[in-house]
């Protein structure tokens, strides 16, 4: 039985360009070598590698980035995720790989600060997800309505329409 390893290094940052515009990112790289063991009995493959624990070495990456604009009432986000098929983080925080996802978010919040209703928000989001073979895996649009009232109670209504998948 040969020892394996999984080393992950990363960096993150938040850049403020003006009162309203910000860019943030997280970037991780991993360097992995599998143990040699018969724990997994599978012929499946990812990229050029087997799922079996046969001592292969591979490197992967993960990127999260957001360009955002926030004013008193408006919030805009453009987000991009990119997790390579070879990325591994054995801590369990990242539970999927082989994906690229871009999303667009726009929201409006009215701070009424009345006795019963403190805040009303209306927002929408579009998300497109695909894998490293450029197969679309998810495409959806969502709408949100949120009302915040006394004693920090919140009502949230969410509607999602998925263009590729149906869960009925």
Segments the model singles out, each with a brief description of its role:
Residues 14-17, 23-168:
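Exposed, low-structure sequence patches enriched in small/polar residues
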């Amino acid at each position: 039985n040969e020892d394996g390893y999984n080393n992950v290094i990363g960096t993150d940052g938040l850049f403020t360009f003006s009162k309203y515009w910000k860019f943030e990112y997280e970037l991780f790289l991993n360097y992995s070598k599998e143990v040699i063991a018969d724990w997994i009995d599978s012929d499946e493959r990812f990229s050029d590698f087997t799922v079996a624990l046969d001592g292969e070495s591979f490197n992967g990456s993960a990127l999260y980035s957001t360009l955002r604009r926030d004013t008193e009432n408006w919030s805009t986000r453009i987000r991009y995720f990119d997790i390579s098929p070879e990325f591994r983080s054995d801590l369990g925080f990242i539970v999927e790989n082989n994906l690229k996802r871009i999303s667009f978010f726009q929201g409006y919040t009215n701070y009424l600060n009345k006795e019963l209703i403190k805040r009303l928000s209306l927002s929408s989001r579009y998300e497109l997800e695909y894998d490293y073979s450029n197969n679309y895996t998810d495409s959806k649009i969502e709408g949100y309505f949120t009302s915040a009232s006394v004693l920090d109670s919140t009502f949230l209504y969410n509607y999602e329409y998925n263009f590729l998948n149906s869960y009925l």
